[in-house]
C-alpha cells in the first residue's frame, strides 16, 4: 500500500480513537448537538477503521507465514506457502476496499435535483429531441422509484419542448444524474425530410442539486422582481382562472426562473425560490469545479454546459459518450429509460480517476 494512503489511515485511526473517547464523555453526552455530530462522524469513520484493522491483522499474518518459509520442517514450509498466497489475496482485496472508502464523498450525491432540458441548434427537430430526452429521464426516474414533477414547460411548435424544467426527488438522484449535464447531440432523419438526409440537432441538459436550508444561498428580497401570470398548459380549466404562475428575476445576475405547474401561487413561489437558489449555488461552484477539472485533467465531471458529451445516432442505433469513448448499440433501450448503461461506466471512470489522484 502507498505510504500516503497508510498515513491517511493512521490519522483516521487516531480520529476514531478520539471519537470513541468523546462519545463516552459526560460533557459531550449532555450536549445533544455535539453528540449527534460526533455520532455521525463515528458512523462514517468506523467502517474504514474496521477494514484497516483487518488489513493490519492480515499483514501480520503474512509476515508470520513468510517467516515460516525458512523453517526446516518441509510440512510447515508447504503450509506457509498456502498461507502466504491467501494472505496476499486478502490484502489486495482489503487495499482496494480501503481505497474506495477513502475516496472523497460528494456532499450533493444524496440531494434531489432540478433537471433543465433546452433545445439548441436544429429548430423543430431539437425541440422534438428535447421531448425524447425528457421521456428518457422520466422513464429512468420511474424505474428507480423517483418522483418527477414538471415546474415549467415551453412546448415546441411541432412537438417536444423548447425548454422543460423538472424537479426529481428520490434516493441518490444527484449522485446518478450529475454527469448528464452538457450538450446532447442527435443524428436522425426528420419526419419532414423527403430526401432521407440525416440531420444533426442538439439539446443542452443541466442537472442542479437542490440545496437544503443550510446550503442555500441567502437571497436579498430587494434583489428580486416577482411577476405573477396565468398558467398555460396542463391543469385543465383552473389554469385560466387565477394568476397562480410565478416568474422570479434575480436582478444582480439576470437569472429568471418560472414555475406554473402547481395550482397554488404559494407552492409555485416556493418551488421557484428553491430552483433559483440551486442556480445561484451552481454559478458559485461551477467556476471552482472547472478550475479543478483543468488542473487534474478530469476525464468526466467538468459539468461544462457547452461540452458535447453524447451523441444519439438513430440510423445506426448507436449512443456514444465522448468523455470516455463509450459506444453502445442499444439506442432504443437507453431512450426507454435504460440510462444506467451509460451512467454506470461514467461513474466507474470517475471513481478510477479519483483513485489515481488519491495517492498523489
UniProtKB/Swiss-Prot annotation:
InterPro entries hit by this protein: PCRF (IPR005139), Pep_chain_release_fac_I (IPR000352), Pep_chain_release_fac_I_sf (IPR045853), Prokaryotic/Mito_RF (IPR050057), RF-1 (IPR004373)
PTM annotation: Methylated by PrmC. Methylation increases the termination efficiency of RF1.
Compartments, as annotated in UniProt: Cytoplasm
Signal peptide range: none
Keywords: Cytoplasm, Methylation, Protein biosynthesis
Transmembrane annotation, as ranges: none
Cytoplasm in keyword set: yes
A Gene Ontology cellular-component term: cytoplasm
Cited SMART domains: PCRF
Primary location class: cytoplasm
Entry's Gene Ontology molecular function annotations: translation release factor activity, codon specific
Domain of life: Bacteria
Residue numbers bearing the N5-methylglutamine modification: 237
Gene3D superfamilies xrefs: 3.30.160.20, 3.30.70.1660, 6.10.140.1950
PANTHER family (UniProt xref): LD18447P (PTHR43804:SF7)
Family: Belongs to the prokaryotic/mitochondrial release factor family.
HAMAP family to which the protein is assigned, alphabetical: Rel_fac_1
Its job: Peptide chain release factor 1 directs the termination of translation in response to the peptide chain termination codons UAG and UAA.
Protein name (database record): Peptide chain release factor 1
Organism field: Pseudomonas putida (strain ATCC 47054 / DSM 6125 / CFBP 8728 / NCIMB 11950 / KT2440)
